[in-house]
Structures are given as C-alpha cells and as structure tokens.
Amino acid sequence: MATPFLPSGATTGDSGGELSSGDDSGDMESFQTPEAEGTRSLAELFEKAAAHVQGLVQVASREQLLYLYARFKQVKVGNCNTPKPNFFDFEGKQKWEAWKALGDSSPSQAMQEYIAAVKKLDPGWNPQVSEKKGKEGSSGFGGPVVSSLYHEETIREEDKNIFDYCRENNIDHIAKAIKSKAADVNMTDEEGRALLHWACDRGHKELVKVLLQYEAGINCQDNEGQTALHYAAACEFLDIVELLLQSGADPTLRDQDGCLPEEVTGCKAVSLLLQRHRASKA
C-alpha cells in the first residue's frame, strides 16, 4: 500500500513514448520464450523486474520513474481511482497525472511496458538471476507490524514529498512546511494515510508530538479504517500509544475488518493499556 515516489518495486522508463509496448515487442519476445524463461508467466517477469528496479533508481531520470510508477500502479491497482492531489503537492500531481494518462490500459500491457522499460535501463539484466530481497509482506500498510511490511526505496532529494520527510523523521522540514502552509497537516496519501499515520508507523514520537501541536486529526482513519492508534498499536510502540491516548485518541474506533486498536497488536502491554483506557471511558 505504499506511496513515496515509487511504490515498492517500481523502476524506470521513458514518458516520451520510447518505451511503448509496440516499440519493444522484440524485447518482450526474448523474455517470453520457453528457452529463456522456462514456464515463467508475464506476471512473474513483472515481479522480477520490480525487484530489479531497486538497484536502478539512482540512474533513472524523473520522467523514467514517473513512467514506471504509472505502470506499476496500473498493474497493482488498476485504473486511476484517486482524487487529484492538492495544489501544493507538486510531485503527487505528477504521479497522479502519469497514472491517469494510462486510462483503461490493461494490466497485461502495463506489465509488458514495465518489463521493456527495465530492459532498456539495464540491457544486461537477466531475470533468471534472483534479486536480493529485504523484508516482505503481503499487505503493506495496515497489517500487523506495519513498518516491517513496507519496502524502503532510495529516493533522491529533489523527488521527495512531505511523506518521505515524515518517514525520515525530518521534523524541521515538516514543521516549516506546515507553518508556511506549503503542506496541510491533515493531507493524506493515496491510501488515506495522514502524516500522523506515517509518524506512528515509524515510531517517531517527537514528530507525533509536533503534528499534534499543529492540530493533526488524531482520529483520522485511512482507507482501511485504521487510525494512528491502530498503527502505533500494530507496531507495538507503547510510548506512542500512551501519547495518543493522553492526547484524546479514541480507542473504540474500529477498522474495516471490525478490529479495535487493541486487537491488532501482538504486544500484551499495549493491548492491556488500550483495554484499560477503553474501559475507563465506558
């Protein structure tokens, strides 16, 4: 569920059309022959290309990153289904426009173009060679121990948005952006996650304090119905759970699966704290 400049696995490409599926049919044929790939499906090749991208981010242009971002989203999500980002989110608007421009493009076409783009970037890439992988997870944000399910990317300074600075715990940058109104403290990413969700997910207690001082919506729910309290509980940050409760977080709000914050944690201390607080408010 991830959202920074590239989703986990996105690679580079060319927004000028050089990497269209029609122009690169030769590349695709070489990938899909039984001799070269055995029984690998197009989807498996796409996943391998996505894994390979992590080592190519630094050599890719902004246009290439946007090209691949859009196709990754088309494969994983489908047609663009999110509102256009606000005026101040310049990078977010570029990403949204690149994705939106694909219209009703099929996942198959998007995968073909994505794979061809990776081949253009690294002609020597061999998808039969396994990529080194970090922590993996099936659902990303919103599941147990959220951070462990989120793949980090290397993002160049000029490509960062407010959520990237939040991940990095860059309190000064975030405070200045909010104070100057360059960013709204309650702005959300495409998954409905606000800055407070991100800060709680990463365990950045001091940043959580700053966001609350700027009146972050403490009970704001993401697209899965999870609050910042769900995130802090799932990641087992007891001190942040305490801070949120002291600041007025509602432990009775349930996510779309019907789970309370106390039910998404594997930490007994966190669960007991939430239960006691909820009981005291009953």
Curated annotation (Swiss-Prot):
Instruction: Give the start-end ranges of region Disordered.
Output: 1-39
SUPFAM superfamilies documented for this protein:
Acyl-CoA binding protein (SSF47027), Ankyrin repeat (SSF48403)
Molecular-function annotations in GO? fatty-acyl-CoA binding; lipid binding
Task: List every position bearing Phosphoserine.
Answer: S41, S106
Is the keyword NADP assigned to this protein?
A: no
Q: Where is the protein localized?
A: Cytoplasm; Nucleus
Q: What Gene3D superfamilies does the entry give?
A: 1.20.80.10, Ankyrin repeat-containing domain (1.25.40.20)
Q: Which PROSITE patterns match?
A: ACB_2, ANK_REP_REGION, ANK_REPEAT
Q: How is the quaternary structure described?
A: Monomer.
| Listed name of the protein | Acyl-CoA-binding domain-containing protein 6
